[in-house]
Design a protein with these regions (language model features):
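Long, positively charged, glycine-interspersed low-complexity recognition regions
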Residues: 343, 347-455
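Non-catalytic C-terminal accessory region of glycerolipid acyltransferases
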Residues: 20-21, 29, 117-322, 326, ...
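Basic/hydrophobic alpha-helical interface regions
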Residues: 47, 81-87, 130, 159
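Membrane helical hairpin/interfacial module
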Residues: 91-102, 108
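Membrane-anchoring hydrophobic helices of lipid-metabolizing enzymes
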Residues: 19-66, 72-78, 83, 107-109, ...
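Cationic, low-complexity basic patches in intrinsically disordered or flexible, solvent-exposed regions
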Residues: 11-13
């Protein structure tokens, strides 16, 4: 009797879960309240955020957003912020193994996506998930899937899985006669994958009309339909961020891209600059590098070896690549010193009031094996503690200080966490500028790499 009761309870729980999942696309008050808070914290997790190409997103059908996956949970969050209306996401199923986290993920409109490596028995669960995806799309709610399946902090693309295309074809089979199904290629570009308070650029490309594509084919075989769709999506995605071909020298090619970009004075994320224009400039440089690798592979291999040695030396000496684009003379150093002194009082204030956050961030970061999660940790800490600390400091300030001073303290606490990181980054680059002044050999290597590439390629 007890066993029967347990089974009945499990079936009831499973039924309730299925009902909840099937309504994952519907509006509910908790999500409506939380989304603006998440969006605000996401915006202030970066120095600069840009969204381009929203005019490319169709309004006459079902839409699947398909971005590259390079920065863990932050990839989903920057997509989420790009829209006012809800977006449902797919994520690795193993994240849902923890029941508490699974409930949070479901609350955030995230579905478990099982991969082949998870075993055949688990893969079969994707049939249920796919039904929910199709229902979501049928109700004209966007669904975001990362075709690569797993994240990798690199300016390239991994092989695209079949999940995105199977979902699109299943949706088209169910309601494609009523309205079309689209896959929108999307490019995500970050100023830095690992440093909190970098930059974020989202670019939506021209959509792939899956319904129109299927109508133009003479085959019903899913495999034969998926392969050309996969090639087309990969080609369009690679046009929306600084793309380099995958391979052993990928990181050296990216390092060379940054070297040439700093030499050309490409301003990426600086005040008054456009992230999109900076990305386009980087793409042109990357295209030149790929062309050189194809036309003169041996010469480029030698140059990339020099780049690798340069990078090892630069990182060992803790010198930022951005220090090379400036004339680090005494006058500039004096100006930077003055700016550091002016900002010091507020940095001290920020360091004190945001200490619970940045200490927690440093602790969690030290225990996070995958560096790609560092930005996610920084965001999570701000989201979890930011409002609580603001309320505590505001109450204390108005209890202990005259209201004008209390109001000032309250307002100054809002950007303190961001200011703390921005000042630290400024100081890191300032110290880097000073160090570079004493590194004649490194400056010489930098100039030789630039000269060699521009002369021979």
């Amino acid at each position: 009797m007890h066993l029967y009761g347990d089974c009945a309870a499990e079936r009831k729980q499973e039924k309730n879960n299925n009902m909840a999942k099937k309504k994952i696309y519907e509006n509910y008050i908790g999500y409506t309240i939380l989304k603006p808070i998440v969006d605000w914290n996401l915006k202030h997790s970066y120095r600069k955020v840009e969204v381009r190409g929203k005019e490319n997103i169709p309004t006459d059908g079902a839409v699947i957003i398909a971005p590259n996956h390079c920065n863990t949970l932050m990839d989903a969050l920057v997509i989420l912020r790009a829209f006012d209306s809800p977006t449902v996401f797919g994520a690795r199923a193993d994240i849902f193994n923890n029941k508490f986290i699974g409930k949070i993920m479901t609350f955030l409109r995230i579905l478990p996506m099982v991969r082949q490596r998870d075993g055949l028995r688990n893969v079969l669960k994707n049939n249920e998930t796919q039904e929910i995806i199709v229902e979501t799309l049928e109700n004209r709610v966007r669904f975001c899937m990362f075709p690569e399946g797993r994240h990798r902090p690199a300016h390239s693309l991994q092989s695209l899985g079949k999940g995105t295309f199977r979902a699109a074809l299943a949706a088209n089979a169910k309601f494609g006669d009523r309205f079309p199904v689209y896959i929108v290629p999307t490019g995500l570009e970050y100023g830095d994958y690992f440093r909190y308070r970098s930059t974020s650029l989202v670019t939506f490309g021209k959509p792939i009309n899956v319904t129109g594509f299927v109508k133009g084919q003479d085959v019903d075989n899913e495999v034969k339909l998926i392969e050309p769709l996969r090639k087309e999506l990969a080609a369009r995605m690679s046009e929306l961020f600084t793309y380099l071909k995958d391979g052993e020298q990928l990181h050296d090619k990216w390092a060379l891209t940054k070297i040439l970009a700093t030499h050309q004075g490409v301003r990426y994320g600086d005040f008054g600059t456009s992230l999109h224009e900076g990305m386009l400039a980087n793409r042109e440089i990357a295209a030149r590098i790929e062309k050189a690798c194809e036309e003169k592979p041996e010469e480029m291999s030698e140059l990339l070896e020099k780049v690798e040695k340069f990078e090892k030396k630069r990182r060992k000496e803790k010198i930022s690549i951005y220090s090379f684009r400036k004339k680090n003379n005494v006058l500039n150093i004096a100006g930077e010193s003055l700016a550091a002194l002016i900002g010091l009082p507020y940095w001290i204030f920020s360091a004190i009031v945001s200490a619970p956050m940045w200490l927690t961030y440093n602790l969690l970061r030290s225990k996070t094996r995958d560096r790609a999660f560092h930005n996610t940790v920084g965001f999570g800490v701000k989201l979890a503690l930011g409002i609580i600390l603001f309320l505590i400091y505001t109450i204390l300030a108005f209890c202990l200080l005259p209201w004008p001073f209390a109001l000032a303290v309250s307002l100054l606490t809002i950007p303190s966490y961001s200011m703390f990181f921005d000042y630290n980054e400024g100081m890191r680059r300032f110290i880097s500028d000073i160090r570079l002044m004493g590194e004649k050999g490194l400056r010489k290597s930098y100039k030789e790499i630039v000269k060699t590439f521009n002369k021979e390629f």
